[in-house]
Amino acid sequence: MVARSKEGKAAKIHTLCMDGEHPEDIKLRFESGRMRVQQRKEKSAHSLYRSVPSPDEVDTIHRLFLESKSLKAQKDAILSGRVESIDALGRSKFKWMKNTIYKNVLLMHPQERNIHGNIFGGYLMKTAMELSWVTAMCFVGKHFPVFLSADKIEFMNPVSIGAIMEFTGRVVYSYSDKFVIQVLAYHIDRETNEKTATNKLTYIYQASSSPEFGSANDLDLCVNAVEVADIVPKEYEEFVAYIEGRRALADYKQSRSSNV
């Protein structure tokens, strides 16, 4: 979390006191938090909006580009975005990224304001989370989505009372039984219809054939995991989102493995 002043600048907070019954445990948790902050800064510095993809990611983008061109040449049923069998490409099923999009447009009311008179960030997070869940349910169809992690939450611009907000959720990456959903929040200018991004949130889910859950200490929280459709991007912006999703899932697996 961060503390902000009403001008949107960093606000000074109290220094954390690490005295207590178990000081070593407290210091260990503090150091873990410090390392997470440092890792977050490093990830931000290597964002795809600030630096070029790695050589491996460039190869992935090119491979996906060639596959998407081949898919475009298939019959109309494939172009419609429905799950289809593509044996020649080695994909049992796929979905175009653009066909996983779901949206929600809301008017921001004063009861959701914070102490600075803007919309409370927790309300925006709640709205985005609900949309990600709907997106996940529609993506897995007859199966059950299992929430695993909120990977990254970005606040780019404050949201004022009375603002018209558009929330857009989509599946940006999938691998085996896991998939990544990205929710973008935009402020819509009612006079110009221009959209300004205010929030970006990333969620990781798993698909299950039943609503049963495993242990919270396991990497997989569901006991009857099922594979989901491969996500195929078309436009360059979708390729960037795909790589972001792949990074998010890799980070999740690494963090869970180190904690087990």
For each feature predicted by the language model, list its residue ranges.
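HotDog/MaoC-like acyl-thioester-processing domains
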Residues: M1-D56, I161, V172-V260
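A conserved, well-ordered hydrophobic junction motif at loop->secondary-structure transitions
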Residues: F94-V134, V140-F147
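Hydrophobic beta-strand-centered segment that forms part of the acyl-chain substrate-binding groove
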Residues: Y123, E130-Q182, Y186, T196-K200
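Generic structural detector for well-ordered beta-strands
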Residues: V105-L107, E154, I204-Q206
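A compositionally biased, intrinsically disordered/low-complexity signal enriched
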Residues: V2, I61, L107-M108
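Extended repeat-based solenoid scaffolds, especially LRR ectodomains
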Residues: K41-K98
